Design a protein with these regions (language model features):
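C-terminal catalytic/motor cores of large multi-domain enzyme assemblies
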Residues: 1-223
């Protein structure tokens, strides 16, 4: 597996003109909504993660900005009709480590509950190396989240043939300024790595601003 990972990453870095754009997200409302929903859904065995909101937000952002949901195909840009988000899953170091990308299909048409359930099921299959080729194929965008490890900021290498990957840090509870007042709130830094053949800087900024609007007003993710 390590040889396959190495080959794909080297191919990505040497053939794709990478660049990165970062943005901070205020997650006070998202964390409060997540706590409320998890309290209401606890009896059903459902627990939404921050990443579930992020995946849903990414899908809705791509529906508005379809150029992020595209690939470079030789000499032209291929626009994808489906929004299939790959979720990077780290494998146990005790079992040799590695990384697999589990693919959630048609994410823009799925609820937070459905995304959460499917992500958990696919992640468990990934950790036991039980994913089928179909469950690892046809992603059009990838999310990599190291927030659960306390990482604040990082950049990720694009997962071909995708044109973008979002690297999410931790939602940190810290002193912040809200309405010109110093208070305690949640902030997350996310960095988007992009293929410059497909997505220009201003296009990336517009996509990130749409995502920011969704995550900072998380009720929009429930519609």
């Amino acid at each position: 597996m390590r040889q396959i990972i190495a080959k794909r990453l080297v191919e990505s870095k040497t053939t794709i003109p990478h660049y990165q754009v970062s943005m901070k997200f205020e997650l006070d409302r998202l964390m409060a909504l997540r706590e409320q929903l998890n309290s209401e859904l606890a009896g059903m065995g459902i627990k939404l993660s921050v990443n579930d909101f992020i995946v849903r937000g990414c899908a809705l952002s791509m529906a508005k900005h379809p150029y992020v949901n595209a690939s470079w195909a030789g000499e032209k840009i291929l626009m994808h009709q489906q929004v299939n988000v790959g979720v990077a899953v780290a494998l146990d170091e005790e079992k040799g480590g590695g990384l697999l990308v589990a693919v959630i299909r048609d994410v823009d048409r799925k609820s937070l509950r459905a995304i959460s359930s499917e992500t958990k099921a696919l992640s468990e299959k990934a950790r036991t190396r039980g994913l089928s080729m179909e469950e690892m194929s046809d992603s059009t965008f990838t999310v990599s989240n190291l927030g659960m490890f306390g990482v604040e900021h990082f950049t990720a290498i694009i997962n071909p043939p995708n044109s973008a990957i979002l690297a999410c840090g931790a939602a940190l509870k810290q002193p912040v300024v809200r309405d010109d007042q110093l208070t305690i709130g949640y902030e997350m830094t996310a960095t988007l790595s992009l293929d410059h053949r497909v997505i220009d800087g201003a296009m990336a900024a517009r996509w990130l601003n749409t995502l920011k609007g969704l995550l900072e007003n998380p009720a929009t993710l429930l519609v």
